[in-house]
Amino acid sequence: MVPVLHSLSTIILIAEFVWGNLSNGLIVLKNCIDWINKKELSTVDQILIVLAISRISLIWETLIIWVKDQLISSITIEELKIIVFSFILSSHFSLWLATALSIFYLFRIPNCYWQIFLYLKWRIKQLIVHMLLGSLVFLVANMIQITITLEERFYQYGGNTSVNSMETEFSILIELMLFNMTMFSIIPFSLALISFLLLIFSLWKHLQKMPLNSRGDRDPSATAHRNALRILVSFLLLYTIYFLSLLISWVAQKNQSELVHIICMITSLVYPSFHSYILILGNYKLKQTSLWVMRQLGCRMKRQNTPTT
């Protein structure tokens, strides 16, 4: 690849890496401080903490995979297992926790009086816990399949860990990992999509009941609907881009197209980095904290640039 393009892509990757760690780190830090001070934390804040931690892990794992891909000859089988399992773990919880957040918005925002809806609404915490525990079945199945495939291939090579065999193993694992991601992502992605459609329906029903002169920014219910829809749309769109970028990256790697592979790696980091920024903008507490941090940084930079007399 042209050195200029390689340098530019490296700068963008580093910028996304820093941005993702800062935005997710802000979510974790602010909510942990509130947890310590108030001795309690709301359900949505608990979800945000674990979601942010999983995304920090996902950002690091994506970067490690990119670096190790450049140094494939130096990877051992055990290192390959750790990298793949860590990526699967962080990707799994990042997706399912975002889905849990979507379901939380669905049951908390709309004013619906169906019996089944009210029953689940008052048990939303138990519903989310059971959903996340149930998702562990898919996680374990995914890891077992990866382990069996890796052990079979390693046995087939007779313990050979040459460069060619490692490149073959890496390609096979990426292919299997992407296939499993496709299959195991169908349920959480569908749940998030259903939540999005039901929120649109709820907003439409709400606007139908409201008089025309009341349909504005002063309507708290409509504002909450729009905020939740903004978060869900960004999640669905960014996760789709994230998955497609991984798929195209794998194809580019097989065809030895380094430029396309690098572009896809850059694109894949947009999901865990920038969706958290959208979550911050949609959360009043986190938004105010981020503005305070930016003001403090601005004041400090201004003081440093002001010449002393």
From Swiss-Prot:
Location in or out of the cell: Membrane
Species in which this protein is naturally found: Mus musculus (Mouse)
Protein's name in the database: Taste receptor type 2 member 124
Misc remark: Several bitter taste receptors are expressed in a single taste receptor cell.
GO MF: bitter taste receptor activity; G protein-coupled receptor activity
Encoding gene (name): Tas2r124
Record-level GO cellular component terms: membrane
Pfam families recorded: TAS2R
Membrane-side (Cytoplasmic) residue stretches: 29-46, 108-127, 205-230, 283-309
Membrane topology qualifier: Multi-pass membrane protein
